[in-house]
Amino acid sequence: VDRQRIDSLDDPDVPVETIRGDITEESTVEAITDAVGEANLVLSDMAPNVTGEYDLDHARSVHLARQAFEVALDLLGAGGDLVVKVFDGRDLDDLKSDIEGEFEYVREVRPDASRDSSSELYLVAKHRLTAPVREGDEIEVEIVDTGEEGDGIAKIEGFTLFVSGVEAGETVTVRVDDVKPQYGFAEPIE
């Protein structure tokens, strides 16, 4: 996706579809969704046209990164990854925190190819979480089975939650400690 025309690739064995559009416009987002369906990776190298005013350039880069993040939320299935370029600055922590809430982990990567004075970095978010629970949630669950390690197993909308120190047949209130793309861990609340 680019606002400018993208030259087609010469290799017919590599199917690449290009979209000329502006990621901040709904019609472009719809074109992406229609073309891709579900993805394993969303990679955004977008950057604003720089003005030389650091705070403005940073804010505009965060806005573009958020647009890519929103597209990723629509396109990525469980376990999918996001890589997004952004300029370092005061709004980076808020953006990173928002992304962390949707992925197993997020890292800042500063490419070696960037100039030493560059504020450019990439947020690399791994393993999209689509679970119906999040870390810190307190919920009541029914223990429906026992796992190989002896933990109780609860099912929430098809999602497996391992609960320590309980047995099948119990109904307990738990606090979710850790969430992975396909399963999570919780402890009973006394």
Segments and roles (model prediction):
Residues 1-190:
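SAM-dependent transferase fold signal centered on methyltransferase-like domains
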